[in-house]
């Protein structure tokens, strides 16, 4: 009995002497990547009162960057990714066997609620093929793009019904040579009967504003109705942006995302096309069903 008590006492002392395991949320996180002609850095901070900010520094001339306010839940989301990919076990340095002169360098450091810190970096090589770090960086970029909405590179909005042609089809694509956009309409006609016209950049900026106001970066990939509707409509929207991998890709049948984002874009495109139609030109499209 005495022996058992001694063992239990020793185990208790051993557990008390162990370093407390780090717990979320993340209170500070900095990621940077440098290449020959490009540099990007994200800095996340969580204040003692729980307020969170994200700063993006881009290019070699930018020293202070821009800062936005982000939800407090971001701190927990970052912690989840750190734990999921076991980032606290990353080595302090990763360097490939062969030197790459025109490659890249990266650095990641973070602090957690109980004071533990993470520091890691590398030269043209990342742990686990970079899966964890890329997921984390893509999330930070998505947060940034959600609030700032980069210039649109391409948009396709389509609504289909029970007929052989689209009820609505609007495509907006950047024309770099003329510093404008090509606006294509194939609504209520066959795809090979589509027409297009040039529109100024300001039109794309109006769509960007709708994307921001309606929080369209939060759109889920798929929306399905609670009950099947045999003669219902289906819709799809795809948006790509300049200088980022962030995209918006969403579709549904009858059910729509919260808000008025899709309807506002549809109405804006409809009104704009009424102005452009007299000057439009044939622009046959390939049917997505062929």
Residue spans for each PLM region:
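Bacterial Sec-dependent signal peptides at the C-terminal "C-region" and cleavage site
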Residues: 2-24
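Charged, low-complexity intrinsically disordered regulatory segments in eukaryotic signaling
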Residues: 5, 35-39
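Short, well-ordered, aromatic-rich surface patches in folded extracellular/luminal domains
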Residues: 16-36, 66-68, 81, 88-164, ...
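Short, flexible N-terminal segments of the mature chain
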Residues: 41-63, 168-192
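A short-motif feature that recognizes glycine-rich, charge-decorated loops
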Residues: 54-90, 184-219
């Amino acid at each position: 009995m005495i022996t058992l008590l001694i063992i239990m006492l020793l185990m208790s002392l051993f557990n008390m002497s162990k370093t407390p395991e780090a717990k979320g949320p993340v209170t500070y996180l900095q990621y940077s990547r440098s290449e020959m002609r490009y540099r990007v850095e994200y800095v996340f901070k969580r204040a003692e009162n729980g307020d969170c900010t994200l700063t993006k520094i881009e290019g070699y001339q930018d020293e202070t960057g821009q800062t936005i306010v982000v939800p407090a839940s971001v701190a927990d989301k970052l912690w989840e990714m750190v734990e999921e990919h076991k980032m606290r076990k990353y080595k302090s340095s990763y360097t490939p066997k062969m030197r790459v002169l025109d490659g890249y360098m990266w650095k990641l450091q973070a602090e957690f609620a109980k004071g533990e810190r993470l520091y890691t970096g590398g030269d043209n090589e990342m742990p686990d093929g970079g899966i964890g770090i890329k997921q984390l960086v893509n999330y930070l970029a998505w947060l940034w793009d959600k609030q700032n909405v980069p210039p649109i590179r391409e948009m396709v909005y389509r609504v289909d019904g029970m007929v052989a042609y689209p009820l609505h089809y609007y495509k907006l694509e950047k024309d770099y040579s003329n510093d404008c956009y090509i606006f294509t309409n194939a609504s209520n006609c066959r795809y090979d009967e589509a027409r297009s016209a040039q529109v100024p950049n300001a039109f794309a900026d109006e769509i960007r504003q709708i994307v921001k106001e309606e929080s369209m970066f939060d759109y889920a990939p798929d929306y399905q109705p609670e009950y099947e509707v045999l003669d219902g409509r289906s819709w799809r929207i795809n948006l790509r942006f300049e200088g980022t991998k962030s995209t918006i890709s969403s579709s549904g049948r009858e059910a729509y995302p919260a808000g008025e984002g899709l309807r506002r874009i549809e109405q804006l495109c409809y009104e704009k096309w009424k102005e452009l139609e007299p000057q439009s030109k044939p622009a046959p499209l390939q049917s997505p069903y062929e």
